[in-house]
Every structure is written in C-alpha cells, then in structure tokens.
Amino acid sequence: MIRVVAVITAKPGRREDVLAAFRANVPAVRAEAGCLEYGPAVDAEGFGSFQAKMGPDVFVVLESWENAQALKAHAVAPHMAAYAARTKDMIASRAIHILSPV
C-alpha cells in the first residue's frame, strides 16, 4: 500500500474555490483502479495549543493506493489534468508526500 499526504496551500481567500473543484473531481478519482481512500481535510477546531494549525488557506488530501502503479496512473489521469488546469491560478503551493507503511 502507498499513502499520500498532499498539503495544498491556496492563494489567500481561495481555499473554498479550490475545495469546490476538488470535490467535483473526487468521484472520478475514487472510481480509479487501486484507489482505497481519497479525501480532503482541514484544521480541526477545539484542540488549543495541542495542535499545530496549518492555517485558513491550507487543506490536506489524504490518499491510500493499492500500489505504486495505481498512484502513477492517478497522477496522469485526464481528470487530474483538468483539475490542475481549473485550479492552477488559485493554488499558491503544494507539497506531495508519498509514504510507505513500516
């Protein structure tokens, strides 16, 4: 299994716009062969100093894939290219962390 933690930083005030485009793309991604989990998450509230918040312009995509082949196919899927084109002017940065369980 391959896990992905993608940290997406939207341009100021654009997170909800990016999330709307992301959510529209979720059904196509979840239908991909090898997709086990794919969804967004934002800072939880109510944890005080226990939590290091990412901020109002950031969301994280939590993904699980059966194997590297499935993730590589996802990266070049046409719906991902369309999502990238729709959101390119709204995203300030992204950091993709690809992880293997130990």
Where are the regions a protein language model picked out?
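Short conserved AdoMet
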Residues: R30, E66, A92
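Short loop segments at secondary-structure junctions
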Residues: P12-G13, W65-E66, V102
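Glycine-rich beta-strand-turn "strand-cap" elements at beta-sheet edges
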Residues: G39-D57, A82-V102
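Short amphipathic alpha-helical segments
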Residues: R14-P40, H79-Y83
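Short, well-ordered beta-strand segments in beta-rich or mixed alpha/beta enzyme
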Residues: I2-T9, G39-A75
